[in-house]
Structures are given as C-alpha cells and as structure tokens.
Amino acid sequence: MEHIVIIGNGISGVTAARHIRKNSNNKITIVSAESKYFFSRTALMYVYMGHMKFEHTQPYENWFWEKNNIQLKQGFVSNIHPHEKQIEFRNGETLSFDKLIIATGSKPNKFGWPGQDLDGVMGMYHKQDLEKLEKYAPDNKACNNAVIVGGGLIGIELAEMLRSRKIPVTFLVREDSFWNGVLPAQESEMINNHIKEHHIDLRLNTNLKEIKSDENGRVKSVIIEETGEEIFCNVVGLTAGVTPNIDFLKESGIELGRGVKVNRFLETNIKDIYAIGDCAEQHKAIGQRRNIEAVWYTGRMMGETLAQTICGNKTEYKPGHWFNSAKFLDIEYQTYGWVFSEIGKKENETYFQWQHPKEQKCITISF
C-alpha cells in the first residue's frame, strides 16, 4: 500500500484525495497550513454578508474524513526532499511519502507598494482574511471607508461584501474599464455602470502609489499615483490578481517557472511528484488556454484526472471546452468556449451581441 501525501486542501487536492479513495486503498494524508477541514473559498463572502455561518462553507461533515480513511494534518511545509521522499515542516518534523501531490494554490500579488504590510491591509483569499475583515471592518463605525485595489472578480466581491454592511468603498482599477482583459467591451461597460449603481466609487485608469500609516501602524490613507490624491480609509483590500504559491519549493530541485512545471499527465520533472490546480504550470499551453489556470473548475478536473494516474490508469489531462462562471452584485456571468475581450480578440473573430434595453442582461456569441 502506497502513501499518497497531498499538500493543500483546496478543491484540487481534496478532489484528488476523494477520487484516489474511490479507486484504491492507498494511505492518503492531506496537509494544510490554513484550516483542518476543506471549505469553499468562493463562499467566504457570504459568511461576512450574514447569509451563512463558516461551518456551512464546508461541503463535507467532519466525520467524512475519518470514515473514508483520509488523514488530515495541519502544518506549514517549508521544504521537500524528493530523493528521500520526505516533506519537511517548519517545526522540523518530517513526513514520508511514496507519491506527492502539490496542490498549494495561489497567493495574492503584491507589487512592493509602501505600506502594503500595515495592519488593515488584506486580501480575500483565505479564512484568515475573513477573520481580518471582521476585525478591521465589522461595521461602518469602525470602518468609515475602504479602498480596494485591483479590478478582477475578487475585488468586486470584496466591494460587495463591504457594501452589505454599508461601508463606503473606493475601487481602484488600473484599466480603462472593469475586467476588460476578459470581457468584450459592451459587457465591461455594462458592469461599470452596474458597479456605480451600487454606490461604489469606481476609479478607472487609477493606480495605487502608497499606503500611509497612522501612529499605531494601521492604515490611514492611500495615495493615488496619477494625481497625488490622498483617500482616507481604515481598510485596504489588495486584490490585484494571484501568483502560484511555490516559494517553499525553490531549493527542492522541482522545475519551476511561474508555477510548478508539469506535463500533460500533471507530472513534474521528478518521478512520483505531481502538481495540480492554481500552482501548476503546463510546459506548453493546451490549445488556447493559459499555462496557468487559477480557476475552480479546472482545479477540480485536474484532481479527478490525476487520481486516475495515481491509481494505475495513466490519464492525460484534457480539459475540453473552456467554461467559467461568476456572480457578483446582481450580475450572473457564464462563459462557454472562447469569447475574447477586445484586447485578446482574434483577427478573424466576429461578435454577435444582444443587450436588454432596460435590464442588465446581455449575450455575446463569438464566431
């Protein structure tokens, strides 16, 4: 019986564990530094908004893991020793494996802004971020203004969370339209208007220069790069994208790029070591996809695929047609196949677009 160790208990790692258990009696250990039990990251916003409790974000009851003979271990992995087939924890403890799956996800980008590590500066990626937000922005008395930096999905979700408690929000987006690296121009403009209708101060073509501190080391204000304007605030949300969480692998001998380099079978350059999810980087992009795809749906598919290989049925990762979905404010967004933004639009690509004259509904077909 082999010992399969999985670092990371997000959707990729947990899916791999579940499917390995369905197809084998191998020993499985999931290691996480964040929380003992798997939870839905996309549901964290609804905890803050009062729609559910944190325990409701856990898809599986606590007894599920023991019943299915999946061991859970909390600890921060500081290094991997591939030739000894051991992982090393920050406290010096080690854990041996026969096969290792790296599913450590991603972490928020930081660009060296002065003040980016002050109290009151946070992302919205982890359970600890939710706890910070409750501490620094419990209501609009403790937090009379928040500034969010970064015009993607996590940024707008954080804005929606804060507005649910009537906290004023200034939203800094460096592009000239919200999410225009993904959305066609008409859809992006529609969402700009929708954001403003929800009383969010949307600042397009705007970059952060500096986060300023009060005398206690807490956020006091931000400075705008283009104008020098100072915006006073109690909370700053840094949501300017993510990068693979792989710093602990730099001395391991595992081939790294922006992420952990893998082939079509999700194998690294070292036998019996694999990578899946946000931290995995394909040597060559599959079709029109990106080399790294930090998307829930692809993470789940990678976990399912790799489980087959681990259990002796070597299977190539073939994600098929692109699909993604999101919900924020009153907008529900879904995409099937390849619909490019104006920035990424192909030379011979044509759009058919329909938009409801009154309601914020639209359809785009690319051909």
Regions found by a protein language model. Give the residues of each.
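FAD-binding core/adjacent interface of flavoenzyme oxidoreductases
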Residues: 1-5, 62-146, 221-230, 237-239, ...
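Mid-to-C-terminal Rossmann-like scaffold of FAD/NAD(P)H-dependent oxidoreductases
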Residues: 2, 9, 279-367
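Beta1-alpha1 glycine-rich phosphate/pyrophosphate-binding loop at the start
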Residues: 2-70, 159-183
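Glycine-rich Rossmann-fold phosphate-binding loop(s) that bind the pyrophosphate
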Residues: 8-11, 125, 150-152
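A Rossmann-like FAD-binding core segment of flavoenzymes
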Residues: 26-27, 71-88, 95, 164-262
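FAD-binding beta-loop-beta segment adjacent to the flavin cofactor pocket
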Residues: 108, 263-274, 350-360
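FAD-site-proximal beta/loop scaffold in flavoenzymes
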Residues: 117-142, 218-221, 229-305
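Rossmann-like NAD(P)H-binding beta-loop-alpha module
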Residues: 132-183, 219
